[in-house]
Amino acid sequence: MKVNHSFLLLFLITLFCACTPKNIYYSTFSTTAIANKGMGVYVLRVQGIGQTYQQAKEDAMRKAVYDIIFKNVSSSYGEHRMIQPVLSNPLTEQQHADFFGSFFSAGGDYLKFVHELRLEKDKFKPQARRGVIMNVVVNRAALAKYLADNQIF
């Protein structure tokens, strides 16, 4: 009888622990250009989220390249101009889904056009999902040439 109660108690404790809320971070942080290095090279401040620190860094670099290709990126330097997206047609991503799927895959070609400048801050505790806000350098001109060479318009 004691064994049954022990198993029941252990089961209930496990069940209650599994039902506790998870620490998931949602943010409205937007990618911002903080410097223009000339020749189509920009320094961006971007946020990445992942289960590990390395995944969060990779997510940030992927997001920086994605935003340069598809979105207007606001600028916090000089005359506060927007950086126009490389591709202005919003349907291009859907039309070339296979290309962009492999381009943005882990270890994909997007890494040729971005590198970390320096880590800004690590905002999350080890037991939670990790997030980083970091500065990255994106070569927009080389990225535009690469997309044109692959006939992505």
Predicted stretch roles:
Residues 9-15:
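Bacterial N-terminal signal peptides
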Residues 19-153:
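Domain-level marker for long, solvent-exposed, non-transmembrane regions
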